[in-house]
Curated annotation (Swiss-Prot):
Keyword terms, alphabetized: Aminoacyl-tRNA synthetase, ATP-binding, Cytoplasm, Ligase, Metal-binding, Nucleotide-binding, Protein biosynthesis, RNA-binding, tRNA-binding, Zinc
An annotated Gene Ontology molecular function: zinc ion binding
Protein name (record): Alanine--tRNA ligase
Cofactor note: Binds 1 zinc ion per subunit.
HAMAP family (alphabetical): Ala_tRNA_synth_B
Pfam families the record matches: DHHA1, tRNA-synt_2c, tRNA_SAD
Length: 884
């Protein structure tokens, strides 16, 4: 039962038997929580439940939560590999009560699992409680039979948890195990508490207060429980090891590294770093994070590049980390099926990133070596060099620090920061200054003054409103007249502001006094709609009553294209796998494109199936429905939330089509959180035509398509091309393909005949230089010839012909191209390869042509040189070598 997978199952099954709902791990990217970069605790997905903002259909739960601590204030990256317990990725086991049971039940459940489920010896266990929580101390005595010396009272914040400056909070009780006198350290609260003898493995948080302001706490009417047990730490205890890297899961991963690299671990930090970083990288990619130069993507890139640097330390000359992925999937795929679903994407992303970084890694390490040649233990690398490594070679600062760690050389962080700030200042100085920053202040002030614009565009394309502000050249203006380019804010609008990939609406704003042609609509700040346009005639002022009219035809095409992206997105997930997630989109009137996570190009057959599946839903002409609900309710119903999008408390859920196969049969085909405009029924899309797909980055593919009238125009153009081609070929349109194939066969035949004729002409003396074609040198037949205008790739074929014609001997040919460069081939017949090496002879010819090197086999070798005028001299040089 002591294996990692067994421990996880034992924990979850125990709490399930005790009435808890097993809730799947939430993604590593927290939903709707901008305060966190990554999920780092089990309670994160329940934060709104604890605060009362969200209701769940259960009052007790248990989870095994994926967690990452890298980046932000919770960052263990620098320590991983060098300590026994630091990890960037770990699993947090937990049980939770949302106003159900409280302190006594929580302690009793924990005690029974620890002593009966995990069979830990009672005499080695002890606990801490908050110094003011006498209730917890009394309960531990009652339930566990602990004496006072086994209950340690802690007065610091270590044993009092709070969500923030305000909100739910409460005392903690931590469970420790004594690992024995042979391990250094003292009990919690003692001067030696940082030692490893007394190991904390489970923290029970009793949420019983609400803090309304610092120091002011009121009892909660329904207190709750939040607990967290580190899975890897419990594995250490049950498996009797001091380091997480000696547990079964890590031993397997490290064993795969040893087998792949042929290098034993023997306490190597590099093996540990690679094993841990593979886990965090794989799970982050599976949850939608891809390497980039900002935000979460940059943290992932730092983790990946640190692993790659340690792979290089082990001697890796080719990408290594992706080769370890199957072992991880085998170990953890059953508990986390997203790893299995995204395996191809993870593998390709790791491989692409390793290939991209490998060359700069070598150059950067060379620069680092040169820069630190004269540095000794305790010295500091200057910040300028560290910044150059970051800026030019893609070395994150922590990678440079890690590379110097073994030599105990530090990095001047202040100097690094100064260098970065100087670069930013220089970049700003080169900026022409569009006034955008000042304009952003204007929008903030207008939002504060007028509030958000009321959007009416889901229900109408025409509305009346009142002008609230006119902005010209980045500043609020009193009025605008004919010819002025303006940005205008109105009290309410049917115009859609660009967001979610959908372009903003165009149209007309008119009044009794004039007209403004609107060329774009944008959103500024939180919900301020800004209409950009030109005053055609009249004068406009604040307070004017206006009529806003959206360009109906353009909006209709935008609706069709936006709805088509939803259908294509779902079809892609069905055809390629559920790892497919939208990474960006453009919904324009005439076309659409969107980027999705997928590791490799799609085949023509896959594109056709995706297109057919989407059009199948179009032909249903089924209604498109929209509903408002909470994010969690929407996701519970199967709605897809797009990675990186921020959602409010209430979201708009768009559903369309009816599934006809598999698990979706009879259910909505596509259901997504979306604030865009859509068709009323799928038939209004008309037709979807996929134009193609391409790469836009590591693990990201771009799909482009047209719909409706644009699709009809595209197909009409294609049809016209086929008719024109058929007329040129003098066949019917349906016969074009067979006629083209026949012409291609005929062309290949003629090209072969032409090549044969060229070879015969070349070897027959018609294009040769001044050297005799065949002669005897040192008793060996030697065919040496310089040939003009021959393709270098044909030289080997000519050399083979030459060998056939002379039977036994050496052939040396030099081809001179139109730009004066030369290619040389030397061939030796089988009976002479022990005497002459074609490689040695072709290098002699190359030297005569001003080149270097050359290579091949003993019987056939090729080289080149820049000086074709020395072709005859190259032939003679080979002849001299034969005679020598």
């Amino acid at each position: 039962m002591s294996g990692v997978n067994d421990i996880r199952s034992t924990f979850l099954d125990y709490f399930k038997k005790n009435g808890h709902e097993i809730v799947p791990s939430s993604p590593l990217v927290p939903r709707n929580d901008p305060t966190l970069m990554f999920t780092n605790a089990g309670m994160v997905q329940f934060k709104n439940v604890f605060t009362g903002l969200e209701k769940r259909p259960y009052s007790t739960a248990t989870t095994s939560q994926k967690c990452v601590r890298a980046g932000g204030k919770h960052n263990d990256l620098d320590n991983v590999g060098y300590t026994a317990r630091h990890l960037t990725f770990f699993e947090m086991l937990g049980n939770f009560s949302f106003g159900d049971y409280f302190k006594e039940n929580a302690i009793e459940l924990a005690w029974k699992l620890v002593t009966e489920g995990f069979d830990l010896p009672k005499n080695r266990l002890l606990v801490t409680v908050y110094s003011e929580d006498e209730e917890a101390a009394t309960l531990w005595k009652k339930i566990a039979g602990f004496s006072d010396d086994k209950i340690i009272r802690i007065s610091t914040s270590d044993n009092f948890w709070q969500m923030g400056d305000t909100g739910p909070c409460g005392p903690c009780s931590e469970i420790f195990i004594d690992q024995g006198e042979n391990v250094w350290g003292g009990p919690p609260g003692s001067p030696e508490e940082d030692g490893d003898r007394f190991l904390e493995f489970w923290n029970l948080v009793f949420m019983q207060f609400e803090q309304t302001e610092p120091g002011v706490r009121n009892p909660l009417p329904r207190p709750s429980i939040d607990t967290g047990m580190g899975l890897e730490r419990m594995a250490c205890i049950l498996q009797g090891v001091q380091s997480v890297f000696d547990t079964d899961l890590f031993r397997t991963l490290i064993g795969t590294i040893e087998d792949t690299m042929g290098v034993k671990a023997e306490g190597s930090a590099s093996h540990r770093v690679i094993a841990d970083h593979l886990r965090s990288s794989a799970f982050l990619i599976a949850d939608g994070v891809l390497p980039s130069n900002e935000g979460r993507g940059y943290v992932l890139r730092r983790i990946m590049r640190r692993a790659m640097r340690h792979a290089q330390l082990l001697g890796a000359k080719e990408p290594l980390v992706y080769k370890l992925l199957p072992t991880l999937v085998q170990q953890m795929g059953r508990a986390y099926p997203e790893l299995v679903r995204a395996e191809a994407l993870i593998s390709e992303t790791l491989k692409l990133e390793e290939n991209r970084f490998r060359k700069t890694l070598e150059r950067g390490l060379s620069l680092l070596s040169d820069a630190t040649t004269d540095l000794a233990k305790g010295d500091m690398l200057d910040g300028e060099t560290a910044f150059k490594l970051y800026d030019t070679y893609g070395f994150p600062l922590d990678l440079t620090q890690d590379a110097l760690r073994a030599r105990e050389i530090g990095v001047d962080i202040s100097g690094f920061t100064d260098a970065m700030q100087r670069q930013k200042a220089e970049a700003r100085s080169h900026w022409a200054g569009s006034g955008e920053k000042a304009t952003e202040t204007v929008w903030f002030e207008l939002k504060e003054k007028h509030g958000a614009t009321e959007f009416l565009g889901y229900d109408t394309e025409t509305a009346e409103g009142v002008v609230q502000a006119i902005v010209k050249d980045g500043a609020v203006a009193a009025e605008a007249s004919a010819g002025d380019k303006v940005q205008i804010v109105v009290s309410q609008t049917p115009f859609y502001g660009e967001s979610g990939g959908q372009m903003g609406d165009t149209g007309v704003i008119s009044s009794d006094h004039g007209k403004i042609e609107i060329s774009d609509t944008q959103k500024r700040g939180e919900g301020l709609f800004v209409h950009q346009g030109t005053v055609v005639d009249g004068v406009f002022k604040d307070g004017d009553a206006v009529v806003l009219t959206v360009d109906h035809a353009r909006r209709s095409r935008l609706r069709a294209n936006h709805s088509a992206t939803h259908l294509l997105h779902e079809a892609l997930r069905e055809v390629l796998g559920t790892h497919v997630a939208q990474k960006g989109s453009l919904v324009a009137p005439e076309r659409l494109r969107f980027d999705v996570s997928h590791p490799k190009p799609m085949s023509a057959e896959e594109l056709k199936i995706v297109e057919d599946m989407a059009n199948e839903i179009v032909l249903q002409n089924s209604p498109v429905t929209t509903r408002l609900m909470s994010v969690d309710d929407a996701i519970a119903e199967g709605a897809m939330a797009l990675f990186g999008e921020k959602y409010g408390d209430e979201v708009r859920v768009v559903a369309m089509g009816e599934g006809v196969r598999g698990a979706k049969a009879g259910k909505p085909y596509s259901i997504e959180l979306c604030g865009g405009t859509h068709v009323g029924a799928t038939g209004q899309i008309g037709l979807i035509r996929v134009l193609g797909e391409s790469a836009v980055g590591a693990g990201v593919r771009r799909i482009e398509a047209v719909t409706g009238e644009s699709a009809r125009e595209y197909l009409a153009e294609q049809d016209e091309r086929v008719k024109t081609l058929a007329a040129s070929l003098k066949v019917q349109p349906g016969e074009v393909l067979s006629r083209v194939e026949a012409l291609m066969d005929e062309r290949r035949k003629l090209e072969k005949e032409l090549a044969d004729a060229k070879r015969k002409l070349a070897m027959g003396g018609g294009q040769g230089g001044s050297v005799d074609a065949v002669r005897e040198v040192a008793g060996v037949k030697f065919l040496g010839k310089a040939i003009s205008g021959v393709d270098p790739k044909d030289l080997k074929g000519l050399a083979d012909d030459g060998k056939t014609s002379i039977g036994s001997g050496v052939v040396a040919l030099v081809g001179v191209s139109d730009d004066g460069k030369a290619s040389a081939v030397v061939a030796v017949t089988p009976d002479l390869v022990q005497r002459y090496s074609a490689v040695d002879l072709v290098r002699i010819a190359s030297a005569a042509l001003g080149g270097k090197g050359g290579g091949g086999r003993p019987d056939m070798a090729q080289a080149g040189g820049p000086d074709g005028s020395k072709a005859d001299e190259a032939i003679e040089a080979v002849a001299v070598a034969l005679a020598g």
